[in-house]
From Swiss-Prot:
It comes from Salmonella typhimurium (strain LT2 / SGSC1412 / ATCC 700720). Belongs to the universal ribosomal protein uS2 family. One of its GO terms (biological process) is translation. PROSITE patterns: RIBOSOMAL_S2_1 (PS00962), RIBOSOMAL_S2_2 (PS00963). The gene is rpsB. GO terms for molecular function: structural constituent of ribosome. This is Small ribosomal subunit protein uS2.
Length: 241
């Protein structure tokens, strides 16, 4: 199973927190100290906590669970999309729309509209419209694709959230809490760990650190899914005998 070592984390700068004046006292147990007015995260805590989170995500994906990757900050946006796509999972990487989980019924209607517009753009419907109407629908399609493209094939609520930056994505975390969906999150020294089921104390800004987390999670999910496929194949083999 995918694991991450302390050396990997040091190289990626996972240990660099935020400036000391911005700290959240609830993160005190995970802080090693401060250097040049920047908090240093205790990687002796982070390494086992991250590997424990990976083990749990592996189990969820082995049970065919759906993982929703959430990271809407510009620095993380593209990496979040790539990681989710690389393991056939789902993502929100632009803006979290309030109610995305708690008001799933309405979201489902918007997804249906998105899929209808996609069909229209491909089957020649747009070409039959006036230029103005075609442009309006193209813009609507782009807007919906931006906000819902990463969850359009999710087919229901996710089984877990993997979040980059607990502070920035606090609305998503609150919605998941309300629905009892487990939250795995990167929590920096300025963030509140409450509401996060699997806290991973670490830098949430450095692109190398973000890429390290996402790469490890995607690899773990792929492994979990292949275990599931292997057990399915075994079952069908037994049935065939």
């Amino acid at each position: 199973m995918a694991t991450v070592s302390m050396r990997d984390m040091l190289k990626a700068g996972v240990h660099f927190g935020h400036q000391t004046r911005y700290w959240n006292p609830k993160m005190k147990p995970f802080i090693f100290g401060a250097r040049n007015k920047v908090h240093i995260i205790n990687l002796e805590k982070t390494v086992p906590m991250f590997n424990e989170a990976l083990a749990e995500l592996n189990k969820i994906s082995a049970r065919k669970g759906k993982i929703l990757f959430v990271g809407t900050k510009r620095a993380a946006s593209e990496a979040v999309k790539e990681a989710a796509n690389s393991c056939d999972q789902f993502f929100v990487n632009h803006r979290w729309l309030g109610g995305m989980l708690t008001n799933w019924k309405t979201v489902r209607q918007s997804i249906k509209r998105l899929k209808d517009l996609e069909t229209q753009s491909q089957d020649g419907t747009f070409e039959k419209l006036t230029k103005k109407e075609a442009l309006m629908r193209t813009r609507e399609l782009e807007k919906l694709e931006n906000s819902l493209g990463g969850i359009k094939d999710m087919g229901g609520l996710p089984d877990a959230l993997f979040v980059i930056d607990a502070d920035h994505e606090h609305i998503a975390i609150k919605e998941a809490n309300n629905l009892g969906i487990p939250v795995f999150a990167i929590v920096d020294t300025n963030s509140d760990p409450d509401g996060v089921d699997f806290v991973i104390p670490g830098n949430d800004d450095a692109i190398r650190a973000v890429s390290l987390y996402l790469g490890a999670v995607a690899a773990t999910v792929r492994e979990g899914r292949s275990q599931d496929l292997a057990s399915q194949a075994e079952e069908s083999f037994v049935e065939a005998e």
